[in-house]
Design a protein with these regions (language model features):
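Long lumenal/extracellular ectodomains of secretory and single-pass membrane proteins
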Residues: 1-135, 145-207
Length: 207
């Protein structure tokens, strides 16, 4: 199925019973796979790059892998926060100790927004899937997933005409976060990829 047919499939897409069966099958497959997915050896951009051009069940499997990577990241951050809190309460309440703890807390707070350089020079080195542009876009969309709620699902492109990117779609009047594949389609849109960059315009947009 094409990306536009993911919800219904391309065989009898008007049959509600078949659509329901398809969704149940996909849900069961993803549930079974999620428990056995090992993501420790995978970088976010590797998953995102494959998801960008995936179709059919490959899309579902890669999305399950992506979600597991996001879950593991949040799990790791919570562990780090707990360790920091324990270290902070067990250490002396000196000014320097408090400042160190506050700085570390800010570092794992998730208050960040990714910026991806999508200019032409990012495509000159490496092989597809591991070029600078693949790493930049993949990590940027991953950051948009794991950022704090108020910074989540957004990013900026760094090119001749920098743009603010939204990774939210409207379904039935509701705002729904995009999948990894959909996020990559937005950030890799050929209409915004350019050959030059404009750092001043980017700063103005962010500010």
């Amino acid at each position: 199925p094409t990306p536009f047919e993911n919800d219904t499939g391309n065989r009898h897409p008007d049959d509600p019973i078949r659509i329901a069966c398809r969704k149940n099958l996909i849900s069961n497959i993803r549930s079974d796979v999620a428990g056995s997915i090992k993501t420790d050896g995978l970088d976010p951009h590797e998953i995102a790059f494959k998801a960008k051009d995936a179709c059919g069940f490959d899309t579902e499997l890669l999305q399950a892998t992506w979600e597991e990577k996001v879950r593991k990241y949040h799990e790791r951050i919570e562990t780090i926060k707990a360790q920091m809190l324990e270290k902070g309460t067990s250490s002396s309440s000196s000014s320097s100790g408090s400042e160190t703890l506050n700085a570390a807390t800010r570092a794992v707070s998730g208050r960040f927004v990714g910026v991806a350089d999508i200019s032409g020079s990012m495509t000159w080195e490496g092989t597809p899937g591991n070029r600078p542009i693949d790493i930049a876009t993949g990590l940027t969309v991953f950051m948009s997933e794991v950022a704090a709620p108020e910074y989540r699902n957004i990013a900026f492109s760094f090119n001749m005409i920098p743009q603010a990117l939204s990774f939210v779609k409207n379904i039935g009047g509701e705002s729904v976060p995009m999948t990894a594949s959909e996020r990559m389609s937005v950030i890799c849109n050929e209409n915004i990829v350019g050959y030059n960059t404009d750092i001043m315009n980017l700063h103005k947009m962010v500010i």
